[in-house]
Amino acid sequence: MAVWIQAGALLFLLAVSSVNANAGAPQHLCGSHLVDALYLVCGPTGFFYNPKRDVDPPLGFLPPKSAQETEVADFAFKDHAEVIRKRGIVEQCCHKPCSIFELQNYCN
């Protein structure tokens, strides 16, 4: 079964590289295409994937914030939050194009 997955990933990447003259160029990889690329890049060592979970409790019972509270909080912490937020593989390779070297960062 694993051989078929690797063969499928190889065929996919060959098809993508034949369309794109520069196969080493960063590409958008989403969903099954991203998983196939990780299988191909990481090989037998495999890769790790830790999907984000929604751990916030339901907040429907809390009153909504006023416009001033929201504006001040967003303005005060916007830059800091963007700096400390770690980019996941979806943000790095699906929302933006990534290279094979960036994919290797997710191998075990």
UniProtKB/Swiss-Prot annotation:
Residues 1-21 form the signal peptide. Residues 54-85 form a propeptide. It is found in: Secreted. It comes from Cyprinus carpio. Heterodimer of a B chain and an A chain linked by two disulfide bonds. This is Insulin. Disulfide bonds join C30-C94, C42-C107, C93-C98. Coiled coil: none annotated. GO terms for molecular function: hormone activity. The keyword Cell cycle does not apply. PANTHER family: INSULIN, INSULIN/INSULIN GROWTH FACTOR. SMART domains: IlGF. GO terms for biological process: glucose metabolic process. Insulin decreases blood glucose concentration. It increases cell permeability to monosaccharides, amino acids and fatty acids. It accelerates glycolysis, the pentose phosphate cycle, and glycogen synthesis in liver. One of its GO terms (cellular component) is extracellular space. Belongs to the insulin family. InterPro entries: Insulin, Insulin-like, Insulin-like_sf, Insulin_CS, Insulin_family. Keywords: Carbohydrate metabolism, Cleavage on pair of basic residues, Disulfide bond, Glucose metabolism, Hormone, Secreted, Signal.
